[in-house]
Structures are given as structure tokens and as C-alpha cells.
């Protein structure tokens, strides 16, 4: 198959290299900076092995990148999805499948609006890998796998064929969900990150500096866990009134095998793949301040949490914790 990866971030590197290294597919990249990429992409895996994948092409031109692709996979932050869909739509083959590596930042809502009504769409509930770029365009770390991935597919005559192809590419079992709501509404990053950000800086004032940068997960507090659980409880009320199969989006406690805020905090502090990840901050001459340009702010509030909040308002479901945290983060979007 011919696969085009759109986006040169952490996930774009690892997904492209992982698929290309298998030697079964032609993998190309659509990126704003093709001149910074090598055709040989090295991926370092958590078990200590490394493997290299050869890219068939690296393009900034959408026509060159997607016109012969069987699968187009967006590995993009929420703010880049609409722009990229508009960029590629005229050059997509009618039978091409267009998808997103994670769907909680509005992929399906935007793709259904912008692309042909017959275009095959797919999207994952959670990212397949935990990924970090080591050397841009050349090397990246695959820091963690998922035991199983959950996928929604729309407009496909044979969804099972696409599911099986993606499972083979990602070397991970994939289960099909009933509809796109089940991947678009997530209690992962869109709730997880804002809960911790509010816990860290809910009382932050302009000009306030900190002496150090805390670890985002390894110092996770019980207060952050309780906020996360409250947001999840509100989301579960929304899911109950949508055409979503019960259990398709497990509760936070079920997913993390926890029983309360204290055990959830312990679990999040202990996850190996999360170790070493620092809170999004930047240095100033007086200390450290929150980095409002980080994807935690630029993606999880306006493209993750906002979708959940808007649907809850449409369904007249109270969401006091989600509202509180969303409204706290809203002023920082302009920064």
C-alpha cells in the first residue's frame, strides 16, 4: 500500500518510521520542512532495539504527497487539521482512506464537513504510540505501545479490510467501534492535561515565576486526579445521551485500573512511558513561567475540551468542573 503521513511532529516521525521499517508499504511524508528530512528514518524502540525505515518521498506539495496514496494519515495537532484537509482535498483519490492518528481534536467533525460525502474516513480513539523526536527529520524514540487500539470508520464498504490493514501496519490489535462519537469524545488528553494544568497553575497571576519545572506525571497530585475524575464523570453523562455503545469509552478509573483519586494519582505517577516528562514551562530571567504556546494549551483546550463542552451545552448537561477549567484556560489562548 501507499501511505502518506501528514505532519512531522513526534507521532509523524514514529508512525512513518515504524511503518516504513517493515518494508511492506511505500511511506511518504507531507511536511512543511521537507529539506530538514532524511529519507532514512531511525526509530529507537523501548526494548533497546533500533530500526530504520526508508521513505519513498518527502513533500511540501499536497498534490505530490497524496495523489496516489491509498491511505492518508494525519498526525497533526488540532489547529492544523482543517488547514491540511483543505490543502489535500482536491488531490485525494476517491477510494483513498483519510484518517487521524487521534480523533479527539475534531478530525471527524471537520472531515465530514470538508471532504467528499463518499470519502472513507477513519480515526483512532487514542494514539498508537508514545513518541518523541530525538533529531528532527532523522531519528525518534518510540517510548510505549498500546495493547489494543480502538478505531472508527465511516463511509467504507469493507471496514474490516481497512481495520485489518491498519492493525498490520501498526502491529497492534485494533477493535472497530460503532461510530465516530466513540473516538471523537475522549477522556484522555482533552481531560487529562487540562486537569493537571489547572492543578499546577489554577492560581497563577501575570508576572508570577516559579523556581523549578515540576514533572508533569511523576508528581501528579491527588487534587489533579480528583479534577480529572470529576471531568470524566461529566463526560460520562454526555455519553449516556449520545448514540455511543456503553463501555466504548471506559471510565478513567476502569482504564487506569484504579478505585479513587488517590490510587489514580499513584497509577499516573508510576507509568514508565510518562517518566521524565516535564510540565510545559519556559525560562525567564526571574525563573520559570507556564508556556502557553505548548500543545497542552494550544490543542487540548480549543480542540479537545471545547468539543466536549459544546456538546454538553447542546444537550443541556451540567458540567461545572469542565466549565471551570475551560474558562480558566480560555484567556491563555490569545497568549
Region annotations inferred by a language model:
Residues 134-231:
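Substrate/ligand-engaging "lid" and interaction regions
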Residues 7, 31, 76, 102, ...:
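Short beta-strand/turn micro-motifs composed of small residues
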Residues 206-212, 218, 225-335:
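NAD(P)-dependent Rossmann-like dehydrogenase/reductase catalytic/cofactor-binding core
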Residues 73-74, 78-140:
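Rossmann-like NAD(P)(H) cofactor-binding subdomain of soluble oxidoreductases
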Residues 30-32, 61, 124-126, 177-179, ...:
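Conserved beta-strand termini and adjacent loop/short-helix elements that scaffold enzyme active sites
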Residues 69:
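An anion/phosphate-binding loop that grips the pyrophosphate of nucleotide cofactors and donors
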Amino acid at each position: 500500500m501507499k501511505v502518506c503521513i501528514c505532519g512531522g511532529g513526534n507521532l509523524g516521525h514514529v508512525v512513518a518510521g515504524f511503518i516504513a521499517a517493515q518494508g511492506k508499504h511505500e511511506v511518504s511524508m507531507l511536511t512543511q520542512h521537507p529539506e530538514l528530512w532524511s529519507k532514512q528514518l531511525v526509530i529507537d524502540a523501548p526494548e533497546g532495539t533500533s530500526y530504520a525505515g526508508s521513505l519513498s518521498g518527502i513533500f511540501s506539495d499536497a498534490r505530490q504527497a497524496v495523489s496516489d496514496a491509498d491511505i492518508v494519515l494525519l498526525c497533526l495537532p488540532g489547529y492544523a487539521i482543517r488547514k491540511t484537509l483543505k490543502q489535500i482535498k482536491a488531490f485525494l483519490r476517491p477510494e483513498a482512506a483519510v484518517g487521524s492518528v487521534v480523533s479527539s481534536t475534531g478530525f471527524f467533525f471537520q472531515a465530514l464537513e470538508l471532504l467528499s460525502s463518499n470519502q472513507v474516513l477513519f480515526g483512532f480513539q487514542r494514539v498508537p504510540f508514545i513518541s518523541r523526536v530525538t533529531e528532527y527529520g532523522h531519528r525518534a524514540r518510540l517510548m510505549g505501545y498500546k495493547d489494543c487500539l480502538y478505531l472508527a470508520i465511516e463511509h467504507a464498504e469493507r471496514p474490516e479490510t481497512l481495520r485489518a490493514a491498519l492493525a498490520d501496519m501498526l502491529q497492534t490489535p485494533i477493535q472497530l467501534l460503532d461510530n465516530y462519537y466513540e473516538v471523537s469524545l475522549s477522556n484522555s488528553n482533552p481531560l487529562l492535561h487540562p486537569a493537571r494544568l489547572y492543578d499546577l497553575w489554577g492560581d497563577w497571576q501575570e508576572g508570577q515565576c516559579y523556581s523549578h519545572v515540576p514533572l508533569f506525571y511523576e508528581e501528579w497530585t491527588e487534587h489533579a486526579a480528583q479534577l480529572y475524575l470529576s471531568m470524566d464523570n461529566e463526560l460520562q453523562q454526555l455519553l449516556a445521551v449520545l448514540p455511543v455503545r456503553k463501555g466504548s469509552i471506559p471510565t478513567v478509573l476502569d482504564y487506569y485500573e484504579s478505585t479513587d483519586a488517590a490510587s489514580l494519582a499513584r497509577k499516573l505517577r508510576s507509568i514508565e512511558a510518562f517518566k521524565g516528562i516535564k510540565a510545559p514551562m519556559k525560562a525567564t530571567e526571574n525563573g520559570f513561567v507556564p508556556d502557553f504556546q505548548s500543545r497542552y494549551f494550544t490543542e487540548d483546550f480549543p480542540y479537545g475540551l471545547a468539543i466536549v463542552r459544546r456538546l454538553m451545552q447542546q444537550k443541556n448537561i451540567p458540567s461545572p468542573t469542565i466549565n471551570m477549567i475551560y474558562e480558566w484556560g480560555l484567556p491563555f489562548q490569545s497568549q
